[in-house]
Amino acid sequence: MSDKLNKGVVICATGSWYDVLTEGGAVCKCRIRGRMRLKGVRSTNPVVVGDEVLFTAEGDDFVIEELVPRRNYIIRRASNLSKESHIIASNIDRAMLVVTLSSPRTAPEFVDRFLITCEASIYEKRVYWKA
């Protein structure tokens, strides 16, 4: 790869490392450019699984330079009770939830939260009940 911008999709986010699936089918281990962390993002994680990104090769390293605008995302309040949010995933085409009726019993409120979260921006959603 050269210094030109390459496009890919984040398939794994672990700490400061991101696995990016390229348009050619290769997987590159990337880091994000430092200035991306400081762009006024009110999220605990600036890059999430599902994000389409533009990245460059710098020697043997790959660096995410920018995010392509997200079509949708699932978000929650950050666990540290700050005013920040935590984006769980982005650019979601469909969401499925498999729940059990017993052993262990799935709380109906959990299904409600799933459906409400998906209602805003995910067009295809399904719930499967396993008896």
Residue ranges and their predicted role:
Residues 1-108:
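N-terminal accessory targeting/assembly segments
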Residues 109-119:
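Histidine-anchored nucleotide/phosphate-binding helix
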